[in-house]
Amino acid sequence: MSLIKHLEYINKNPILKKSFEFGVEIIKLSKNIRIKYKEYSLADQLLRSGTSIGANANEAVIGSSKKDFINKMNISLKEAYESRYWLLLLASVDNIKNPDFYLDEIDEIIRMLVKIVKTSKETESAKK
C-alpha cells in the first residue's frame, strides 16, 4: 500500500488522524529541543510517549478482539497522560516555545481516548 493510501486510512478515523498529527508535531518539537537546548533525555521521553499514542491506537483499530481494542486504547491514554507530563515539565523550564498549542492538542487527544475507552467498556459490559 502506498503512503497516500496509508494516510487516507488514517484520516478516516478521528483518533488515528489526531494522534498521527500530534506525533508529527512531537517529532519536530523533540528535534528542536535536542538541537536548541541540548536536552536529550527529556526530548527522548517526550518523543517516545508522544509517538506511542498513535502507534497503540493504530494497533487497537486492527486488534483481534474488543478486549484487545480496549487494552490498546488504554495504553494510548496512558501514553497521552505521560506526554502531557513531559510537555508540562519542558514548558516549566522554558524549553517549549508555544506550550499551549501542544497542551491543547494533548488534552483533546486525552478527551477523545477517555470517551473511546469509556464507551467501549460500556458496550462490552452490556453484551455480558
Where do the language-model regions lie?
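Short, C-terminally biased terminal segments at protein or domain edges
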Residues: 1-55, 59, 63-128
